[in-house]
Regions:
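Sec-dependent N-terminal signal peptides
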Residues: 2-9
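Short, low-complexity N-terminal intrinsically disordered segments enriched in polar/charged residues
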Residues: 4, 16-54, 75
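A solvent-exposed, acidic/Ser-Thr-rich amphipathic alpha-helical stretch
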Residues: 48-103, 115-122
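Hydrophobic residues on conserved beta-strands that form the core of alpha/beta folds
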Residues: 95-97, 111, 140
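Short, hydrophobic/aromatic-rich segments at coil-to-beta transitions
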Residues: 106-110
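Residue-level recognition of well-ordered beta-strand positions that form the cores
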Residues: 111-115, 130-132
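Short beta-strand edge/turn micro-motifs at domain boundaries
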Residues: 124-146
């Protein structure tokens, strides 16, 4: 009988830990989603500086697109400003199909799709974002966009 009681207590404890883990994952996903929502809102206002607030402000930030690798927050900002130098080029940004993988309480990966609605075209693609929780909040430390 003692073994059954101990087994039952162990199962309840394990279920409690799993529930807390799922709750934590949901919380982290929501916090990261907020960063991405803020980014798309800034982009859609024509505010590239505001969009970049979601990125780690470090020379170690890595942005990969096609065959190009850009390192550093400022070079990444400069790249965006050069490539999207008008509201027409910026269009309306939408993120979709988001899949969150929580690696630790301070690290996560997001796989998703992006699209720009513009007058003359509608470019779109996929991305993988690596997020880390910093003192300022969740920030993208690596962005691989295609």
């Amino acid at each position: 009988m003692k073994i059954i009681v101990l087994l039952l207590i162990s199962l309840l404890f394990a279920a409690s830990i799993a529930a807390q883990s799922d709750s934590q994952k949901t919380k982290i996903s929501a916090e990261i989603r907020k960063v991405m929502d803020d980014q798309s809102a800034a982009w859609n206002r024509g505010d590239i500086d505001g969009f970049m607030a979601g990125y780690w402000r470090s020379e170690k930030l890595t942005f990969i697109s096609g065959t190009d690798v850009t390192r550093g927050w400022q070079p990444t900002l400069d790249r965006y400003k050069k490539g999207y130098d008008s509201r027409a080029k910026m269009g309306v940004l939408t993120f979709s199909d988001l899949e969150f993988t929580i690696l630790a309480k301070d690290a996560a990966v997001v796989l998703g799709s992006w699209s720009l609605a513009r007058d003359k075209d509608n470019p779109h693609g996929k991305f993988t974002l690596t997020f880390r929780k910093m003192k300022e909040g969740w920030r993208i430390i690596m962005d691989h966009t295609s």
